[in-house]
Design a protein with these regions (language model features):
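Proline-aspartate-enriched helix->loop->beta-strand connector
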Residues: 113-126, 145, 245-258
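Structured C-terminal subdomain patch of bacterial secreted/periplasmic proteins
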Residues: 159-167, 173-176, 258-327
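Short helix-initiation/N-cap motifs at beta->coil->alpha
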Residues: 49-51, 102-113, 236-245
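Alpha-helical, coiled-coil/dimerization segments enriched in small aliphatic residues
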Residues: 90-93, 212-241
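Bacterial N-terminal signal peptides
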Residues: 18-27
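Bacterial Sec-exported substrate-binding components of ABC uptake systems
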Residues: 2-15, 28-71, 172-203, 260, ...
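Extracytoplasmic ligand-binding site segments that recognize negatively charged/polar headgroups
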Residues: 132-135, 151-164, 197-219
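A short, structured surface patch at a secondary-structure boundary
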Residues: 65-119, 123-129
Length: 327
């Protein structure tokens, strides 16, 4: 999916100012490629990325991941020894035990171009679901950096990216282990759906407030749909624009799921309490009264589960279809 590009004049001015300096220094400061299996692979891989661009990449020796989940996925694909730079959530959210030489590129939405260029990656993995990273494309191309954009919102997206990455690393056994093996777990969870089509409300809470999410372009939303749930925001998109307790009470979903987002979950909890939970009417919801209100693990249901997709599906199936048994 290609996102609409917003204009960021300040960012563009900053990029223009640093491009000349960076281009002059790249050749002089190019570091030695780390040794690894990739040094023995010569066959290029061509594919269409999620911005619709044709990308042809040689097996990379130096990779930069502009989002932590992509750093995690690249490691799963057998590329740990070639990862030279990553966004800061690779440390704060994923605890990947990265080598001390891996460069911290800053926030996912504020990638440090100077640091990225100095790391001399021959492949950059970027998120097409992050507008600020899409906006960086002209600058990355002007710097001569090869970049591939991916959107991973559902399990099939993960399988697709893992397949491509294992082709690039040459470690196809990793796809069998972390792709096809996990797919069997996911399918077993799907098979437990009994056709009852339970209704669900999905709320994402942050320190800034709470938003209702539908089934599109979010990990938990896509997963609920895949397991046969009916997200009430799919048929009433006014909930996406303005969270309305009155409308939630009218629709009275069978299940309510909340994901707390942000480094300090207590801030998200306060926002949730203030917005919804403190209202006495909240307690009248069937899901609340019958114990079907769940706070879900941010790592599994907001960030990308990657190797834990099967675990995430199984836990959600346990909640939705407790009587279906394990496949």
């Amino acid at each position: 999916m290609i996102l609409e590009r917003n204009e960021y004049p300040a960012v563009k001015r900053r990029i223009f100012c640093i491009l000349t300096i960076l281009c002059l220094t790249l050749a002089a400061c190019a570091p030695t490629a780390p040794a690894g299996n990739g040094s023995e692979r010569t066959q290029s891989v061509s594919f269409t990325d999620d911005l619709g661009r044709t990308v042809t990449a040689e097996p990379p020796r130096r990779v930069a991941a502009l989002i932590g989940s992509f750093a995690d996925l690249w490691q799963l694909a057998g590329g740990a020894d070639t990862l030279v730079a990553a966004a800061d959530d690779a440390w704060t959210s994923f605890d990947l035990n990265l080598d001390e030489d891996v460069v911290d590129l800053g926030g996912v939405k504020q990638i440090n171009l100077e640091q990225l260029a100095a790391a001399q990656p021959d492949l950059v993995l970027a998120s097409s679901n992050t507008a600020a990273q899409v906006e960086l494309l002209p600058a990355l191309e002007q710097l001569g950096l090869k970049v591939a954009y991916f959107k991973v919102a559902e399990f099939q997206d993960y399988l697709h990216m893992l397949d491509l990455c294992t082709q690039l690393t040459g470690d196809t056994d990793r796809f069998a282990q972390y792709g096809l093996g996990v797919e069997r777990q996911v399918q077993a969870a799907r098979d437990r759906a009994d056709g009852s089509a339970p209704t669900a409300l999905y709320i994402r809470a942050t320190g800034a407030g709470c938003k209702v999410k539908n089934s599109r372009d979010s990990v938990l939303g896509e997963m609920l749909r895949d397991l046969g749930c009916v997200n009430i925001a799919d048929s009433d998109e006014t909930l996406l624009e303005q969270l309305s307790l009155e409308r939630i009470l009218q629709l009275d979903p069978d299940f309510i799921f909340v994901v707390m987002q942000g480094a300090d979950k207590s801030e998200a909890q306060r926002a949730l309490d203030h917005t919804l939970l403190a209202n006495p009417a909240w307690q009248s919801l069937t899901a609340v009264q019958q114990g079907r209100y769940y706070v879900m693990d941010d790592r599994l249901y907001n960030l990308k589960p990657n190797a834990r997709w099967g675990e995430a599906y199984e836990h959600l199936a346990d909640i939705l279809y407790p009587d279906a048994g394990q496949a």
